[in-house]
Amino acid sequence: MGKTMREALDISAYLVVGPENTEGRPVREIVRAALKAGFSCVQIRSKETSAREMIALLGEAAEEIRAAGVSEHVALLADDRLDVVLAARKMGIKADGVHVGQSDIPPEICRAYLGEEAVVGLSARTDELLAYVRDTDTSAIDYFGAGPLHETATKPDCGRDAQGNIITRSFEEIDELARVSKIPVVFGGGVKLPDIPALAKTGVDGFFVVSAVAGAPDPEKAAKELVDAWQAGKAATSGAKK
């Protein structure tokens, strides 16, 4: 018997994409390009589309994942919308789970509705990030999504304190974050190609990007450069530890 998606989950190269990020190109084209380049997880995120449009986007992304032959190990998630994932599944779409924020539907509720084999991710964006990651009950969660590294227009709510000030993270903080977390961590927020080698040297399990791929003139080339840089950075780090 093969692994469930929860067991096979790979967040090393994580694409977040929606219609507002693609410079007018179809979302499925960006997904296709990322898959060709070796991206391992896809999240459909849009604050501007209806539930029906989100379901359609999930369906198109699922088709691209199936066509690439990677349905067994590339997870397809929806941002925030548990209802969309449930409806998509009812319509026969292979939606693997949901990513929620700290003010969205609680992860344990998502888990109850989606089942034990689903993927449930949780954003960790707070001025007390290390304490939050260390102390949060992770029994219903598969990974944390944390950030940002730099200020970013695609996720303007990412990493603000109670006063609304943007809090970016140093590589030292990111490494400490990975050390205190009981579950895998994917890190992003303004991440670009030059950041990848240093990010790969930290203990996080992957990087997530939006505009670095979805907004690139050549999304497949940009995605491939990111994946190659991550893998090279991890290989160098692994070699240095031996």
Language-model-detected regions and their locations in the chain:
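Short, flexible/disordered intra-domain loops and linkers
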Residues: P156-T168
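Conserved N-terminal beta1-alpha1 strand-loop-helix module at the mouth
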Residues: M1-G97, G115-E128, Y132-D142, N165-E176, ...
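Gly/Pro- and small hydrophobic-enriched strand-loop and loop-to-helix capping segments
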Residues: I93-E108
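Short gly/pro/ser/thr-enriched loop/turn and capping motifs at secondary-structure boundaries
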Residues: P106-P107, E151-T152, A214-G215
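Flexible loop residues that form catalytic
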Residues: K47, S103, L149, A212
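A short acidic, helix-capping loop that chelates divalent metal ions and anchors anionic groups
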Residues: I44, H150-G159
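Non-cysteine beta-strand/loop elements that form the S-adenosyl-L-methionine
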Residues: G101, I141-H150
